[in-house]
Amino acid sequence: MANRAKSIIPAEVFPPGEFLRDELNARGWSQADFARIIVRPLQAVNEIINARKRMTVETAKAIGLALGTGPELWLNLEITYRLSTTPAPDPAIKKHVAERSAA
């Protein structure tokens, strides 16, 4: 049997608003409907859906309550997306940290 190297395929990372858009569509809710349900401005909901606004803890709590998911799901999606879109630390900083943490 041939020895095959297993390759790891990274999970797709997407903004939480993309998932929220799918949820609203599945429930037949407009963005305006949802904004009224979670008592947030329509503009804020639209900006989250279009990845122009970060999700706050308060908004994640409201969304989780409205959709029956809990805030953790939304905050995990948010932080995973933000980490994937943030540049890696400067190599000089990485070197400095490695030197300091080895001491």
Regions found by a protein language model. Give the residues of each.
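Residue-level detection of the helix-turn-helix DNA-binding "recognition helix"
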Residues: 39, 50, 79
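Alpha-helical hinge/cap motifs
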Residues: 28, 51-52
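Residues within the alpha-helical elements of helix-turn-helix
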Residues: 26, 37, 66
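A short, Lys/Arg-rich alpha-helix, primarily the initiator
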Residues: 2-29
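Short alpha-helical DNA-recognition segment
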Residues: 29-47
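Short, basic-rich loop-to-helix N-cap that marks the start of a DNA-contacting helix
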Residues: 52-67, 82
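Short amphipathic recognition helices of helix-turn-helix/homeodomain-type DNA-binding modules
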Residues: 70-97
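Short, intrinsically disordered, charge-balanced linker/junction segments flanking boundaries
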Residues: 100-102
